Amino acid sequence: ECLIGNYVVTGARRCAPPLSLGTGFYEGNALVLSTYVQGKWYVMAWNKLVSRPFVLQHQLYFQEGIVHEDDLWSFKLACMAQSMYVVDETTYYYSMQPDSIMRAPSMRNLECRVLVLGYIYDFIRSSRCLQDNRLIYIYFESLKAKYFDRILYFTKDTSFHYQSYLVFRNKKYASLLEMTGLRPEWKLMLQNIHYVLPTYAGYLYFKAFVKSAYYLLVLSIKMKAVFHAK
């Protein structure tokens, strides 16, 4: 139903999402979906061949009126596909421009991040199986932190920071008891403390958590670079 190849990106200082699956046939939705939410194949829609009957059957169309629609489309693809073939060879070359929406996003781009998260939430809510999937829960909550990190980094508009947080806080499909049953990782448990705090305190906590996670990530990358240089 889906064929994915590897790719090379030029013009980007930061690493692009890798394809970390070997060449071969991946059968069964559980395998296809788990490899996606674990970040083993990339979110971008390009360099994927998808069966036309499959697209029509599942109405797998791009959401109109937004950017970053790849995030929503690829997630739906992963949730629906029963089989996937991977070719671990470069079949696509992508040159990232300095003024691309990934490197210099506008407020509209950031607003669309919030919209996309809402669409993904609605899609998960439409299926009990998706709601009960532990990896989906970890993916969705981690996506909130990822999007909020982009928002904090690319705009200083604190009003937008807060309004985005309110959306992320409200898009919660698991109760505290259900969260525990889904066995989140320790880092996610720390992140999710914001849910039990009063709203504004939760906002401050979530903001601090996301910033701290970013600084720790940058520090680890720099340390690896230093050791590699030696």
For the regions a language model picked out, list residue spans one by one:
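Donor-binding/catalytic cores of nucleotide-activated saccharide
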Residues: 1-85, 92-106
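Intrinsic disorder/low-complexity segments enriched in polar/small residues
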Residues: 9, 142-145
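All-alpha amphipathic helical-bundle segments outside canonical DNA-binding/catalytic cores
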Residues: 131-140
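Membrane-interface aromatic/basic loop that binds lipid-linked glycans or pyrophosphate carriers
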Residues: 156-230
